[in-house]
Amino acid sequence: MTTIVSDSGMIRYKIITAEWLIYSHRNPPFWAFEKGIYLEKFDSLFHVDASIKADTAYYYEPKKLWELRGNVHIQSQRGDKFDTELMFWDQDKEKIYSDKFIRIEQVDKVLTGYGFESNQQMTEYQIYNNTGIFTVEDNAVQADSTQTSK
């Protein structure tokens, strides 16, 4: 099933899923995507802002909160790749976050950590308890440790 979702007359998302369950009479009402989801988020010019893939997802309508679970893969507009097992996207607060292990792959580095918080565009973020692999240029002249200063 492929669905286009609009908000205020603007196309915002394309959702591809095998099953979309809507629990409108539950408290709180929510959507369930228990057989996986692929979602593309569009900007105002209809460019793909981000793509999201997860094994399971829930969308809590009143809170405008997405809960993504299992093999969560996100690619930002800049091309950065985010991988985790659990991610929340709070649309009202325009914030994306997780308290689980996260791996972020950029062109020139890989960052990992436990816990993550980002703006909605995934351009500014903080990683907690982090480590990373990245290139460091070694252009500095090394001081001779055998010489003493006078």
Predicted regions and their residues:
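Mature-chain termini and adjacent capping regions
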Residues: M1-K150
